[in-house]
């Protein structure tokens, strides 16, 4: 078997799964599989685009006040009152629960456990198991199947940036120290007690967020380690020209644990 071709296909499959799991696209696609939901929206004159967006946002947020949802859906209508009117229609259609005493909307539709786990693993770009493509313009990222921006956030421009540096750091071979992942416990700061002014509910949310991140990170690391004995991280600039590696679960610019589990594939003793 040609190992290089196998790794290439593995990398393409990882990228295809990532593209499929772009957050809003994937969540909306789950709702679009249910014909009953479309029938309800049509019956109550709820535009499908708005309805699916609304359901996806509610599934992700679980509960939210109307102001928050209006802000998230503002691209559908120029008039904020129109968005409120459509949300009221969704309440009448029983697509969401409204608790008048708390003034909050609560989702009626939970994502399945399998879908949620796949989203957790693949909604962010993963490390590459083959060398990244050479980037030749600001719209490339090094990934085989998808472009993007080499300038982070909403700061894209066509001006010259140092592509040579990006290509150089993109091709550094890295590996995971799986013994460290098992023997050293990952932790975030201030999870042992509530912050000043923090509610018990918010404290619990922070702990739950860490548990979810940590569990998913270990699964992603196992996936990458099984695919190849080395991996590559892609990089981009911020608007001030500082270099950041792309990676949510695996990132050598993270906390102490994130740094400790990543090593150079080709090591040498520093004199």
Predicted features and spans:
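Non-catalytic nucleic-acid-binding interfaces of large nucleic-acid enzymes and RNP effectors
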Residues: 1-271
């Amino acid at each position: 078997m040609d190992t290089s071709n196998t790794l290439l296909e593995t990398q393409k499959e990882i990228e295809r799964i990532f593209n499929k799991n772009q957050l809003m696209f994937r969540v909306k696609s789950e709702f679009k599989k249910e014909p009953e939901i479309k029938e309800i929206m049509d019956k109550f004159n709820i535009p499908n685009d708005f309805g699916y967006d609304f359901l996806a946002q509610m599934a992700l947020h679980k509960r939210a006040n109307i102001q928050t949802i209006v802000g998230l859906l503002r691209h559908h209508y120029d008039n904020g009152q129109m968005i409120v009117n459509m949300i009221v229609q969704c309440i009448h259609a029983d697509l969401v629960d409204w608790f008048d005493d708390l003034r909050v909307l609560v989702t009626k539709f939970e994502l399945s456990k399998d879908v949620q786990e796949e989203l957790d693993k693949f909604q962010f770009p993963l490390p590459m198991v083959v060398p990244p493509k050479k980037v030749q313009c600001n719209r490339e990222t090094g990934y085989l199947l998808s472009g993007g921006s080499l300038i982070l956030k909403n700061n894209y421009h066509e001006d010259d940036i140092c592509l040579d540096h990006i290509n150089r750091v993109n091709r550094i071979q890295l590996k995971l120290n799986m013994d460290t992942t098992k023997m050293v416990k990952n932790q975030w700061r201030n999870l042992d007690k509530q912050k000043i002014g923090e509610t018990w509910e918010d404290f619990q949310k922070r702990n739950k967020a860490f548990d979810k991140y940590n569990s998913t990170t270990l699964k992603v690391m196992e996936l990458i380690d099984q695919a190849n004995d080395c991996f590559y991280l892609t990089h981009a600039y911020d608007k001030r020209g500082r270099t950041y590696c792309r990676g949510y679960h695996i990132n050598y610019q993270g906390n102490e644990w994130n740094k400790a589990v990543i090593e150079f594939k080709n090591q040498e003793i520093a004199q």
